[in-house]
Amino acid sequence: MLKRFFFAAVLTIFLAFPLHADDQPALVSFKVMTLETAQKLAQATLDDCRKKGYQVAVSVVDRFGTVQVTLRDRFAGVHTPETARRKAWTAISFRTDTITMWEQTKTGTTASGIRFVRDALMAGGGVPVEAAGSIVGGIGVSGAPGGDIDDECARVGIESIADLLEF
């Protein structure tokens, strides 16, 4: 009888105080851009580069690096869609723009080995897209005569959807 009481008491304690790992939930939630938002971002970026006289490709990826939208202007080089995708992927993967990554991974720096990560591309034009302090996607631009111009176009595109990203 005492054993049954003891067993019941121990069982009650375990049920009353569930085991947990640092109070972490079993599931997480996150925000991603809708397809429509990604399309607006890509088109606004392409339009800005066109206005500046450049034919480019633009790729928008979600927070996991999966392509949501890719646009290639009529005379953009055949390599530009893949280059834009890799820039966008690099920006979200390393959580920083690719101009900064280019600087931080130059030959001779402690981070130079990052340049050998498959699909990583350390060339200007990749920028993470953030909303309320969280990365919700990334954008990559390729085709302007320099990564700095690709980067400028990407940032103009992001600014064009800023009101959609506020929550």
Label each region the model flagged:
Residues 1-2:
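N-terminal secretory signal peptides that target proteins for export/translocation
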Residues 5-18:
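Bacterial N-terminal signal peptides
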Residues 22-167:
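Flexible, solvent-exposed loop/hinge segments and secondary-structure transition points
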